Amino acid sequence: GMDQSASLRCRAGHALELDCRTGGVEQVPFDLAGAGLALLVIDTRAEHSLVDGQYGARRAACERAARLLGVELLADVPPGELDAHLGRLAGCGQAGAEELVRRTRHVVTEIDRTRRLVALLEDDRPLAGAKLEEVGALMSASHDSLRDDYECTCPELDVAVEAARAAGAHGARMTGGGFGGSAIALVDTGEADAVARAVVRAYAEAGFAAPAFLNALPSGPAGRLA
């Protein structure tokens, strides 16, 4: 799974690209420290609970959409053919068709965003300027899709992401399974505290409990300390 792979198969200064179909991984250059950047992890302190079946409901919707489209997985839908496939779902005449459209649009565009991000990180340009803007924009677009099409965020996650962006984060998004948990913001190292303070203020204004923070860098796998 994703969490296990991130814990055991990662490499310092790299992001881990995981193919969930095959279990294969690729190490992608992601030297944040060398670029003067950090990932600010924002623990929303919102209860991370999927017990009401929402996670399972989304998986079921994706599997149903794949069956209707005649593909094994929604990952098999080419991004260039997405609109045509969404039109088929919208016109299928079945209950919940609009939900299937949203879920499918998220899955296909999220895979495309991931591939575009990997291609960006693998090119030879420094992680700065236009390249950094593109990376941040892809992160933010991912959150917007998770919020609007996959509908797995929560108010605490959305406030954290919006506040981080407004305070100067290059990009921000929820991470993990959603419905609570944490968000991440790509920030200049020297601006991490200012972004964190902005999130704390936004939480206070919204009446949420104060969040917690961690400045993270891509690191090696878990191992024995002694």
Residue ranges: model-predicted function:
Residues 180-186:
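Short beta-strand->loop micro-motif that forms the acidic, two-metal-ion catalytic signature
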Residues 12-171, 186-226:
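C-terminal nucleotide
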